[in-house]
Design a protein with these regions (language model features):
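Formylglycine-dependent sulfatase
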Residues: 1-226
């Protein structure tokens, strides 16, 4: 038994919008629009109460917010108590800010934490072995938005070597419409041009600093829409 079922059984109208991440068939909800699995930031698919899947054009944070407010303000039975779940995808990795936020936050520089270069010498085994190091684990395409063709042109000059997920750049990118790509591309061009021209000349300290900025720019750009 889920807690929405308990609310429903006690006379509440129930609704759920966004990322469930525990299967795609929520129980005990009168109306739902759920992202399949993790979902996508751009033009995401949603599974409705009947189990049908539809693609909605736009940015996932805006869409989930609009669906939630639409039900809350217009669709629910105002004579009944209600239980509504409003569940954002952001800021789950890989981070894809909206086109506007991508341009805005890529131009920002963020303070570095004192622990950026922590060597974890005095930490436990779990902390030492977790794959959470920006330099050695953060992926070039998946996380930093380096196009696969940029990496290919660099002919082995991209060190350290970091294993990528399949289709980690173009999977999300190719969901964008032509109009959306026109907004993303100038920013992606600037990121890739800088990487191509500077990465091979950087030392590990400089590489860590650059990856930290790319992480913060995309993470905060994604969460700022919430």
């Amino acid at each position: 038994v889920t807690f929405p079922q308990i609310f429903q059984e006690n006379g509440y109208e129930t609704a759920m919008f966004g990322k469930l991440h525990f299967g795609n068939n929520p129980k005990g909800v009168d109306e739902s629009m759920i992202l399949p699995d993790q979902g996508f930031y751009l033009n995401p698919d949603f599974i409705d109460t009947k189990g049908d899947t539809t693609t909605i054009t736009g940015y996932v944070t805006d869409i989930i917010t609009d669906l939630t407010l639409g039900w809350l303000q217009e669709k629910r039975n105002k004579e009944k108590p209600f239980m509504m779940m409003y569940m954002h995808k952001a800021p789950h990795r890989p981070w894809w800010p909206s086109p506007e936020k991508f341009a805005e936050f890529t131009n920002k520089e963020f303070p570095e934490p004192e622990t950026l270069f922590d060597d974890y010498k005095n930490r436990g085994t779990a902390a030492k072995t977790a794959e959470m190091n920006l330099l050695t684990h953060m992926m070039y395409s998946h996380d930093s938005k380096i196009r696969p063709e940029t990496l290919a042109k660099m002919e082995g000059k991209v060190l350290p070597v970091v294993e990528e997920f399949p289709n980690s750049f173009y999977g999300p990118y190719n969901r964008a419409t032509a109009e959306q790509k026109a907004l993303y591309d100038p920013v992606l061009d600037s990121i890739n041009d800088f990487f191509y021209n500077n990465w091979p000349k950087m030392n590990d300290t400089e590489k860590m600093k650059w990856k930290y900025q790319r992480y913060m720019q995309d993470y905060l750009g994604s969460i700022s829409s919430v």
